[in-house]
């Protein structure tokens, strides 16, 4: 059975840990959400192929900037996450996360993931953003950023409602099993 290492990165509080907990337990976490979810390994079937999917959470806070790259070696696919209701986290994909991932792993496939999809149409959330002269990130904006960073796919999901959640991980597996021909064949990430 093929083993796939999937590492999840993005700003603090964009919902990386909730994404992983919701996917692996089929339940949105209650009050307590840890900073970092323990590494998790699951046997899953995608396109009738059995795969051992290893999920690695990371802490997005700056305090972890030196430690985080230690989880990057041998990564098969990255999920770079931003919150659809946090324009700052969207900008940081370009400013921080894409450069960091590419520095350590020049050819590992990336899936860009917009989280908190359930809040994009939430009146209170929209109102709070409006007060700061901001708005939620739209699907076309997400697609444009995905193209800019040469992401394999752009997907949106909600860990709360689970809408689009399984697709994120299925597509992460497909990005490894069915690599796009334009990418270099050597994908494993190594620490230099």
Swiss-Prot record:
Documented effect of changing residue 62 to K: In IMD73B; gain-of-function variant; exhibits impaired GAP-mediated GTP hydrolysis, resulting in sustained GTP association and prolonged RAC2-driven activation of downstream effectors; when transfected into cells, shows increased basal reactive oxygen species production following stimulation by PMA compared to cells transfected with wild-type; increased interaction with PAK1, compared to wild-type
Name of the protein in its database record: Ras-related C3 botulinum toxin substrate 2
Primary role: Plasma membrane-associated small GTPase which cycles between an active GTP-bound and inactive GDP-bound state. In its active state, binds to a variety of effector proteins to regulate cellular responses, such as secretory processes, phagocytose of apoptotic cells and epithelial cell polarization. Regulatory subunit of the phagocyte NADPH oxidase complex that mediates the transfer of electrons from cytosolic NADPH to O2 to produce the superoxide anion (O2(-)).
PTM-bearing positions, type ADP-ribosylasparagine: 39
Tissue distribution: Hematopoietic specific.
Subunit structure: Interacts with DOCK2, which may activate it. Interacts with S100A8 and calprotectin (S100A8/9). Found in a complex with SH3RF1, MAP3K7/TAK1, MAP2K7/MKK7, MAPK8IP1/JIP1, MAPK8/JNK1 and MAPK9/JNK2. Interacts with PAK1. Component of the phagocyte NADPH oxidase complex composed of an obligatory core heterodimer formed by the membrane proteins CYBA and CYBB and the cytosolic regulatory subunits NCF1/p47-phox, NCF2/p67-phox, NCF4/p40-phox and the small GTPase RAC1 or RAC2.
Mechanisms controlling activity: Regulated by guanine nucleotide exchange factors (GEFs) which promote the exchange of bound GDP for free GTP, GTPase activating proteins (GAPs) which increase the GTP hydrolysis activity, and GDP dissociation inhibitors which inhibit the dissociation of the nucleotide from the GTPase.
The UniProt record lists the keyword Ribosomal protein: no
Motif interval(s): Effector region: 32-40
Phylogenetic placement of the source organism: Eukaryota, Metazoa, Chordata, Craniata, Vertebrata
One Gene Ontology cellular component: cell projection
Protein family according to the UniProt entry: Belongs to the small GTPase superfamily. Rho family.
Residues carrying Cysteine methyl ester: 189
Signal peptide positions (record): none
One of the record's GO molecular function terms: GTPase activity
Organism of provenance: Homo sapiens
SUPFAM superfamilies: P-loop containing nucleoside triphosphate hydrolases (SSF52540)
């Amino acid at each position: 059975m093929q083993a796939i290492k999937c590492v999840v990165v993005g700003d603090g509080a964009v919902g990386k840990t909730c994404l992983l907990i919701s996917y692996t337990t089929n339940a949105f976490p209650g009050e307590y959400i840890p900073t970092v979810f323990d590494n998790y390994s699951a046997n899953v079937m995608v396109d009738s192929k059995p795969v051992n999917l290893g999920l690695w959470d990371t802490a997005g806070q700056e305090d972890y900037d030196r430690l985080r790259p230690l989880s990057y070696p041998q990564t098969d696919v990255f999920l770079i996450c931003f919150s659809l209701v946090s324009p700052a986290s969207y900008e940081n994909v370009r400013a921080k996360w894409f450069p960091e991932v590419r520095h350590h792993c020049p050819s590992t496939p990336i899936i860009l993931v917009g989280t908190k999809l359930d809040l994009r149409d939430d009146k209170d959330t929209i109102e709070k953003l409006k007060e700061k002269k901001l708005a939620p990130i739209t699907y076309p904006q997400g697609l444009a950023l995905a193209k800019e960073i040469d992401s394999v796919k752009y997907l949106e999901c909600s860990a709360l409602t689970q809408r689009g959640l399984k697709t994120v991980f299925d597509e992460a597996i497909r990005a490894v099993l069915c690599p796009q021909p334009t990418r270099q064949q050597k994908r494993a990430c190594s620490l230099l």
